[in-house]
């Protein structure tokens, strides 16, 4: 964990790759047989673009910065790398993975456990909103992989329940989101508490200045891998807008849309928790079945809602951007931005989930006069077109 001067000249927003070797099958990566078995059992057939590029340099021990959106297979990229590098016979934390939200941390834990199914390893999720005592107990058992949110992880390291002496790898997922959520100080503190030799792997959708600073301070001559925007996942997603004259008319517009379209599963995004609750009440009053999720809810509630949504027993989920980061719901065919996102980066996180790995999807944006500028910005930023919604939209979903 040292400095790399080469990063200071990178324009904000995008890194330049300095590594272009690709390995296009898992069999050629020289992985442990138990790990390979887990990868295929999980349903992977061949590596995605980021997996072809990033797994090998991580396994070889390089510090790695990978710039990639959710939906590109990045969780499996670092999960496979971590599992290849840890020693299952050593009951101590050897890899620490940080994520910005509890949901994402739990999802990463599930992937690590599933892919590592034949390896006899433990992976513990160390997240806020759960019992501190349970955390302490689980950490004393020496899980080889710990995945968590910065606050709780920092607390557990300070209290010496999460011991860092055997730590080989530190992974920061969605680094841009973690730093923008105000976790910078805790992340810097965690870096200081890790062994000097710890390998650092950082993943981020965007590369703002605060992320570049972390890479400069704590990474040694990192391999830089950029999965370009056109390789990401707006492809295959039809994007439309509906012009709504006034904010108050969005509700009727949504009700009309419900009448026209048969929805297998949809996510409706609002910008505030209050709006999520308000919209949920209004739709419920109109006899539409919806569930809601945002950061004010406790962990058990959020887990239950996600479970119902994943299993299909709940079909329409109204959420804030909390859900937009990395939560994988396979069968979402429609995303509605009731509010356009407050920043353009979140647009791809919201709608990029509708057509992940080439699955088709439809995104519909409700746009008032105040939103037109933001919509144009989004179009420009992603070099994409958002067209007026056609009358036959039902045929497209």
Curated annotation (Swiss-Prot):
Enzyme class: hydrolase
Annotated catalysed reactions: ATP + H2O = ADP + phosphate + H(+)
GO annotation (BP), single: cytoplasmic translational initiation
The protein's Enzyme Commission number: 3.6.4.13
Helicase ATP-binding domain sequence ranges: 55-225
Sequence motif DEAD box, location on chain: 173-176
UniProt short sequence motif Q motif, positions renumbered to this chain: 24-52
SUPFAM superfamilies: P-loop containing nucleoside triphosphate hydrolases
GO cellular component, one term: cytoplasmic stress granule
Main location: cytoplasm
Protein localization: Cytoplasm
Molecular function, one GO term: translation initiation factor activity
Chain residues that bind ATP: 68-75
UniProtKB keywords: ATP-binding, Cytoplasm, Helicase, Hydrolase, Initiation factor, Nucleotide-binding, Protein biosynthesis, RNA-binding
UniProt-listed InterPro entries: DEAD/DEAH_box_helicase_dom (IPR011545), EIF4A_DEADc (IPR044728), Helicase_ATP-bd (IPR014001), Helicase_C-like (IPR001650), P-loop_NTPase (IPR027417), RNA-helicase_DEAD-box_CS (IPR000629), RNA_helicase_DEAD_Q_motif (IPR014014)
Free-text comment about domains: The Q motif is unique to and characteristic of the DEAD box family of RNA helicases and controls ATP binding and hydrolysis.
Function: ATP-dependent RNA helicase which is a subunit of the eIF4F complex involved in cap recognition and is required for mRNA binding to ribosome. In the current model of translation initiation, eIF4A unwinds RNA secondary structures in the 5'-UTR of mRNAs which is necessary to allow efficient binding of the small ribosomal subunit, and subsequent scanning for the initiator codon.
Assembly, per entry: Component of the eIF4F complex, which composition varies with external and internal environmental conditions. It is composed of at least eIF4A, eIF4E and eIF4G.
PANTHER family xrefs: ATP-DEPENDENT RNA HELICASE DBP3
Protein family membership: Belongs to the DEAD box helicase family. eIF4A subfamily.
Protein name: ATP-dependent RNA helicase eIF4A
Organism: Neurospora crassa (strain ATCC 24698 / 74-OR23-1A / CBS 708.71 / DSM 1257 / FGSC 987)
Source species taxonomy: Eukaryota, Fungi, Dikarya, Ascomycota, Pezizomycotina
């Amino acid at each position: 964990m040292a400095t790399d001067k080469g990063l200071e000249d990178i324009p904000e927003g995008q890194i330049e790759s300095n590594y272009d070797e690709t390995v296009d099958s898992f069999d050629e990566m020289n992985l442990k047989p138990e790990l390979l078995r887990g990868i295929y059992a999980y349903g992977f057939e061949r590596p995605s673009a980021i997996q072809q590029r990033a797994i090998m340099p991580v396994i070889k021990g390089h510090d790695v910065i990978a710039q990639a959106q959710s939906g590109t297979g990045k969780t499996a990229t670092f999960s496979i790398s971590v599992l290849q590098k840890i020693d299952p016979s050593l009951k101590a934390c050897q890899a620490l993975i940080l994520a910005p939200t509890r949901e994402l941390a739990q999802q990463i834990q599930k992937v690590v456990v599933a892919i590592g199914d034949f390896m006899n390893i433990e992976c513990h999720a160390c997240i806020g909103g759960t019992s501190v005592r349970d955390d302490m107990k689980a950490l004393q058992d020496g899980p080889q992989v710990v995945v968590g949110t910065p606050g709780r992880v920092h607390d557990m390291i300070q209290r010496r329940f999460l011991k860092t002496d055997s730590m080989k790898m530190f992974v920061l997922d969605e680094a841009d989101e973690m730093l923008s959520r105000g976790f910078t100080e805790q992340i810097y503190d965690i870096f200081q508490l890790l062994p000097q030799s710890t390998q650092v792997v950082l993943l981020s959708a965007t590369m703002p200045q605060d992320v570049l600073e972390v890479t400069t301070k704590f990474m040694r001559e990192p391999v830089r891998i950029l999965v370009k925007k056109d390789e990401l996942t707006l492809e295959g997603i039809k994007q439309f807008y509906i012009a709504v004259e006034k904010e108050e008319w969005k509700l009727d517009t949504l009700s009309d849309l419900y009448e026209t379209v048969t929805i297998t599963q949809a996510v409706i995004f609002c910008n505030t928790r209050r709006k999520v609750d308000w919209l949920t009440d209004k739709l419920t009053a109109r006899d539409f079945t919806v569930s809601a999720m945002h950061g004010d809810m406790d962990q058990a509630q959020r887990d239950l809602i996600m479970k119902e949504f994943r299993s299909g027993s709940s079909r329409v989920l109204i959420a804030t951007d909390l859900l937009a980061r990395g939560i994988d719901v396979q069968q979402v065919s429609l995303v509605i931005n009731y509010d356009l996102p407050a920043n353009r980066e979140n647009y791809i996180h919201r709608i990029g989930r509708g057509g992940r790995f080439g699955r088709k999807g439809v995104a519909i944006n409700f746009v008032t006069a105040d939103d037109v500028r933001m919509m144009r910005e989004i179009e420009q930023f992603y070099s994409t077109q958002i067209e007026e919604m056609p009358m036959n939209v039902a045929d497209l979903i």
